[in-house]
């Protein structure tokens, strides 16, 4: 399974497709299919019928709109710099951290940390 640089909660801009130029928050990520669901983008309508519930009632049917997944290559990360939305890329760097063992002793280790390249250039 491929590791994606886009994570849930990121602000992204759609760079291809019918919703090109739209900016929204990532609601979910599917790394196996390399797809992301972006808030307010790729809206699809689902026709649902009235369904009985186990409690004896019914859930109301109708036409329900929801976001459909889009391929991760069609989105790019967005960050706010000086109040403007700026598209950026993602980089990873190694950071020294101190970890603690269950017996209380500490040791030095490294952790990979994600950062936005445009924010780094500032």
From Swiss-Prot:
Highest taxon in the source lineage: Bacteria
SMART domains to which the protein is assigned, alphabetical: KOW
GO molecular function, a single term: rRNA binding
GO CC, one annotated term: ribosome
Chain segments annotated as transmembrane: none
Gene3D superfamilies, per database record: 2.30.30.30
SUPFAM superfamilies: Translation proteins SH3-like domain
Pfam (any one): ribosomal_L24
Cited InterPro entries: KOW (IPR005824), Rib_uL2_dom2 (IPR014722), Ribosomal_uL24 (IPR003256), Ribosomal_uL24_CS (IPR005825), Ribosomal_uL24_KOW (IPR041988), Translation_prot_SH3-like_sf (IPR008991)
HAMAP family: Ribosomal_uL24_B (MF_01326_B)
Self-association state and partner proteins as the record states: Part of the 50S ribosomal subunit.
Family, similarity comment: Belongs to the universal ribosomal protein uL24 family.
Known role: One of two assembly initiator proteins, it binds directly to the 5'-end of the 23S rRNA, where it nucleates assembly of the 50S subunit. One of the proteins that surrounds the polypeptide exit tunnel on the outside of the subunit.
Protein name: Large ribosomal subunit protein uL24
Organism: Cutibacterium acnes (strain DSM 16379 / KPA171202) (Propionibacterium acnes)
Gene name tied to this protein: rplX
């Amino acid at each position: 399974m491929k590791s994606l640089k886009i994570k849930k909660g990121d602000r992204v801009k759609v760079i291809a497709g019918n919703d090109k130029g739209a900016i929204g928050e990532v609601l979910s990520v599917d790394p196996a299919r390399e797809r992301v669901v972006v808030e307010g983008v790729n809206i699809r309508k689902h026709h649902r019928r009235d369904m009985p519930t186990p409690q004896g009632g019914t859930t109301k049917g109708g036409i329900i709109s929801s976001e459909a997944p889009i391929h991760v290559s069609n989105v790019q990360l967005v960050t706010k710099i000086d109040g403007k939305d700026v598209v950026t890329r993602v980089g990873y760097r190694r950071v020294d951290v101190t970890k603690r063992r269950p017996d209380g002793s500490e040791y030095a280790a490294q952790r990979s940390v994600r950062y936005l390249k445009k924010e780094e250039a500032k």
